[in-house]
UniProtKB/Swiss-Prot annotation:
GO terms assigned for molecular function: cellulose synthase (UDP-forming) activity
Family matches, as Gene3D superfamilies: Spore Coat Polysaccharide Biosynthesis Protein SpsA, Chain A (3.90.550.10)
Family membership: Belongs to the glycosyltransferase 2 family. Plant cellulose synthase-like F subfamily.
Species of the source: Oryza sativa subsp. japonica (Rice)
Protein name according to UniProt: Putative mixed-linked glucan synthase 1
InterPro entries named in the record: Cellulose_synth (IPR005150), Nucleotide-diphossugar_trans (IPR029044)
Length: 860
């Protein structure tokens, strides 16, 4: 079907490009449709057939077959290389040979783990127009979960924009609800949500009237121009000015919330002698944490809170008012209903492990079951927003398409993470396109991608630990469970579970939130509710691991569920990423440490049952062991120290053949990488940044994670990973100020040492070539060694810019400094090292002659 014949989708009078039926896979130079006959047959049946809700594409054979051949060829080359090395064992430096051999074997093993799951990349494209044809009036309910903790580390402006973008999403307003979990229990977050509920009465109808994209006001107003898709272009300018003015006032109120609450509390405390409480606007104590900590009102010790800020709307549209003095924006033809909005802060008590984000998600899962009980759940981090207003419709294409296409067996749909405000060169590989568009896309050909923590739609019953329908109906499985021991003692919550198993149902809110419901909600948010249950193990998000997202997805895959990796244009969701070097390193430290925790736990992929696809098992094994190989990379990067303490060294003899093997296997992996760049649709810059940041992590962060894990195994104590802090551009006035800020931490030291060693090794190599001549054996060996050193320094180039701080804006300074350092080391070697090495060589030769004479004895 050509683009000219695309079917138009109108929702609230809006044209959405995401809703066109794209069927041009055959025209793509990389991807080809695999279900073309199915699609064409359904659409050519005079309306009797129903087209599928998504289309599937595979990589063309002209790319896939050479790609697979190269993988096989490199595997053969690696085996031949190992066999050759064993036959030519270096006995002069046995310890070095043994160490490098073990490292190379692990390199080969980890490469196989990484490469095998990539053999059949599949792309699945949702057809939102087909969804509208088949489910125009019966889309199922969705509960949207948003998590946040600290309004400082996670700026509150991000959170309010996330909530506003969700409230304005293009989905039936009476069929989804939004829940915010504030794990800090702060009044600032609660009153920010009160402000959001008020501003949404203006923002959401404005979005519907003019079909604006994106629907996060901060990002929308930051855009310079965009195509107009609404139906009243003549009113856009005046409405835009009015709404923007209101938004700026809204931001002022949000920014001043902390001081406003403090001033109010000071006034109330002055009236109540001896009190130092934090007061709400209605003159009552805030039940959460106070500015001045007190008993039952501090971090880690406060009551649970559930507040419905926006009630569930009616099923019938409610049109707004015409323009007037009180209502300057004309919403007379616009549905002004708002989705349900709920604020949650779970109870915290000393002596309980609250399990961070996973614990908060499980509380929201229980509370939402009582208040809305939608059969599908989407979760967001507090700094991710809805970038494509139809983002909630896209995953439904995969969840609702049965027809033998696996929809009913799909546990979750994962969208790639896309980021704003990353520096143009993506210095620290924040976009991570190689992982999202390469690795995750390739898993679509197996059981599906892993769960990545945000931008994910779940089937509620899959979170409850129910197995996929191929092993029995969900309702039957739930009835057969030991419900009290598995899910807890709340009969109200248990009563919602069978309804949650019906994927076709909409939201059915409680008629009245009376005292009995309030009591149930308090019980569900209590610390003790999960005692003696399966929450955090077989039910909900998994506990006691830093990467609870990956392990939660793994639990579903091992039960036989499938997942889907879906990408739409424009991107469904966008968020923020840490552009500061230290924060980025701490982020990947948490990820790598959590991966190792997964390997050394009952969630090890080797322990999964037969329902886990063999190559999916390999993929999870790779995800949980990748930091281990970096220990060998770290020591390889320190090998240049040998240039500083000896005249020459050999890892393997004969060196010439060793070098040929090495060049061959390295060249092949880069050619394979180019094929992946092609089918993943990424740029060479993306690939290069991925290579560079992998080396940066391998020289400090990943070995540190291995050390942490070793200490945990020895001592039995858990690992604490700090929350990645994010800063708004407005806080400093410079969009990329964090990029040039140096935060010195011990985590930087190993990589700095590696850089110093390799710069010194380059200097020694230059000195050797100058002292002995580039054509002599010491000279040309020095030049070859220098190639390795320079390659390491090129990979560590982004790190070097990061530790330079403001000087990183002038890369020329780095090159000049390195050139001067190399020249200084080379000069010192020529002046002191070369004569010393010559003297040692002379002494060694003399000793050799004496030894030979003593062995042969006197002649005659």
């Amino acid at each position: 079907m050509s683009a000219a014949a695309a079917v138009t989708s109108w929702t609230n009078g809006c044209w959405s490009p995401a809703a066109t039926r794209v069927n041009d896979g055959g025209k793509d130079d990389v991807w080809v449709a695999v279900d073309e006959a199915d699609v064409s047959g359904a659409r050519g049946s005079d309306g009797g057939g129903r087209p599928p809700l998504f289309q599937t594409y595979k990589v063309k054979g002209s790319i896939l077959h050479p790609y697979r051949f190269l993988i096989l060829a490199r595997l053969i080359a690696i085996v031949a290389f190992f066999a050759w090395r064993i036959r030519h064992k270096n006995r002069d430096g046995a310890w070095l040979w043994t160490m490098s051999m073990v490292g190379d074997v692990w390199f080969g093993f980890s490469w196989v783990l990484n490469q095998l799951p990539k053999q059949s990349p599949i792309k699945r494209v949702p057809d939102i127009a087909a969804l509208a044809d088949r489910h125009s009036g019966d889309l199922p309910g969705v509960d949207v979960f948003v998590t946040t903790v600290d309004p400082v580390d996670e700026p509150i402006l991000y959170t309010v924009n996330t909530i506003l973008s969700i409230l304005a999403a293009d989905y039936p307003v009476d069929r989804y609800a939004c829940y915010l979990s504030d794990d800090g229990g702060t009044l600032v977050h609660y009153e920010a949500m009160v402000e959001v509920a008020k501003f949404a009465e203006l923002w959401v109808p404005f979005c519907r009237k003019h079909c604006v994209e994106p629907r996060s006001p901060e990002n929308y107003f930051a855009m310079k121009t965009q195509a107009y898709k609404g139906g009243v272009p003549g009113e856009l300018m005046s409405d835009h000015r009015r709404v923007r003015r209101e938004y700026e006032e809204f931001k002022v109120r949000i920014d001043s919330l902390s001081s406003t609450i403090r001033q109010r509390s000071d006034v109330y405390n002055a009236k109540h002698a001896g009190e130092n409480a934090t007061w709400m606007a209605d003159g009552t104590h805030w039940p959460g944490t106070w500015f001045e900590p007190a008993d039952n009102h501090q971090r880690g010790k406060h009551a649970g809170i559930v507040q419905v800020l926006l009630n569930h709307p009616s099923c019938k549209p409610r049109l707004g008012l015409a323009a007037s003095a009180e209502n300057p924006v004309d919403f007379s033809g616009v549905d002004v209903r708002l989705p349900m909005l709920v604020y949650i802060s779970r109870e915290k008590r000393p002596g309980y492990n609250h399990q961070k984000k996973a614990g908060a998600m499980n509380v929201m899962l229980r509370v939402s079951a009582l208040l809305s009980n939608a059969p599908f759940v989407i979760n967001f981090d507090g700094d991710h927003y809805v970038n494509n207003s139809q983002a909630f419709r896209a995953p439904m294409c995969f969840m609702l398409d049965g027809r033998g296409r696996g929809g009913e067996n799909t546990a979750f749909v994962q969208f790639p993470q896309r980021f704003d405000d990353v520096d143009p060169t993506d210095r620290y590989a924040n976009h991570n396109r190689v992982f999202f568009d390469g690795t995750m896309l390739s898993l679509n050909g197996l059981q599906g991608p892993s769960y990545l923590g945000t931008g994910t739609m779940f089937r509620r019953v899959a979170l409850y630990g129910v197995e996929p329908p191929r092993w029995g109906a969900a309702a039957s499985q739930i009835k057969a469970m030991d419900i009290a021991n598995k899910f807890g003692s709340s009969t109200s919550f248990v009563g919602t579970m069978l309804d949650g198993a019906n994927q076709e149902r909409s939201i059915t809110p409680l008629a009245v939130l009376d005292e009995s419901v309030a009591g149930d909600l308090a019980a569900l948010t209590a610390c003790a509710y999960e005692d003696g249950t399966s929450w955090g193990r077989d039910v909900g998000w998994v506990y006691n691991i830093a990467t609870e997202d990956v392990v939660t997805g793994f639990r579903m895959h091992r039960q036989g569920w499938r997942s889907v990796y879906a990408s739409v244009e424009p991107a469904a969701f966008r968020g923020t990423a840490p552009i500061n070097l230290t924060e980025r390193l701490y982020q990947i430290l948490r990820w790598s440490g959590g991966s190792l925790e997964m390997f050394f736990s009952h969630s090890n992929a080797l322990l999964a049952g037969r329902r886990l696809h063999p190559l999916q098992r390999v993929a999870y094994l790779n995800m949980s062991t990748y930091p281990i190989v970096t220990v060998f990379i770290f020591f390889y990067n320190l090998f240049p120290v040998m240039w500083l303490i000896s005249e020459q060294y050999y890892i393997q003899r004969p060196f010439g053949e060793y070098l040929l093997y090495l060049v061959a296997v390295i060249a092949m992996i880069h050619v394979i990488g180019m094929f992946e760049v092609k089918w993943a649709g990424i740029t060479l810059l993306d690939w290069c940044r991925n290579e560079q940041f992998y080396m940066i992590g391998s020289t400090g962060v990943y070995p540190t994670a291995v050390l942490y894990m070793a200490l945990k195994l020895v001592t039995g104590k858990g690992i604490y990973f700090r929350l990645t802090s994010k800063q708004t551009a407005a806080s400093s006035g410079d969009k990329f100020a964090d990029l040039y800020t140096v935060r010195w931490v011990p985590l930087l030291i190993p990589t700095i040492v590696i850089m110093v060693v390799n710069v010194a090794a380059v200097g020694v190599a230059v000195g050797k070539a100058a002292a002995w001549g580039p054509l002599t054996e010491p000279g040309w060996l020095a030049v070859l060694g220098m190639v390795f050193n320079v390659w390491i320094l090129v990979l560590l180039y982004p790190f070097a810019l990061g530790v330079m701080g403001q000087w990183g804006k002038r890369p020329a300074v780095l090159f000049v400094a390195m050139a001067m350092a190399v020249a200084a080391v080379a000069a010192m070697y020529v002046a002191f090292g070369a004569p010393y090495q010559a003297e040692l060589s002379g002494v060694a030769a003399s000793l050799g002659k004496v030894a030979a004479a003593s062995l042969t004895g006197p002649s005659g």
